[in-house]
């Protein structure tokens, strides 16, 4: 299971976060982690990350929305608690697990995933 502690980033900043976008691809949600970035575009989920902070090489994974089996979002109710997103991709047994810092609004991401899976 890949677990990433993330902060939300403005979608407009995504172009400077990664050079892996194709012409005409629009970023709807972007999250940054200490070791990488995860982008939710109109076409796919793009994950670019290093194994650890000192690693120079970056591994990039691209998942079309059709490979998303299902997702779950758990929002923190208590002040200062984290929200989590789990996304089951392709034939991977364990989900991609994003832990968002307190105050992160995950409703736009939930709406995007629901629209893409409908």
Feature roles, as predicted:
Residues 4-17, 47-62, 115:
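Charged, low-complexity, helix/coiled-coil-prone segments
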Residues 78, 84-118:
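Low-complexity intrinsically disordered segments
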Residues 21-37, 41-93:
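Phosphoinositide-binding peripheral membrane targeting modules
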Residues 16, 29, 66-73, 97-98, ...:
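Hydrophobic transmembrane alpha-helix bundles
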Residues 1-38, 90, 101-103, 118:
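Anionic N-terminal interaction surfaces
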């Amino acid at each position: 299971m890949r677990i990433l502690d993330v902060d939300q980033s403005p979608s407009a900043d995504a172009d400077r976060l990664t050079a892996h976008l194709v012409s005409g691809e629009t970023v709807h949600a972007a999250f940054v982690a200490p070791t990488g970035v995860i982008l939710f575009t109109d076409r796919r989920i793009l994950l670019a990350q290093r194994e650890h902070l000192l690693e120079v090489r970056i591994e990039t994974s691209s998942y079309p929305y059709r490979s998303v089996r299902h997702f779950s979002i758990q929002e923190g109710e208590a002040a200062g608690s984290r929200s989590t997103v789990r996304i089951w991709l392709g034939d991977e047994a364990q989900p991609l697990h994003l832990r968002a810092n307190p105050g992160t609004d995950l409703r736009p991401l939930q709406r995007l995933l629901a629209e893409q899976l409908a």
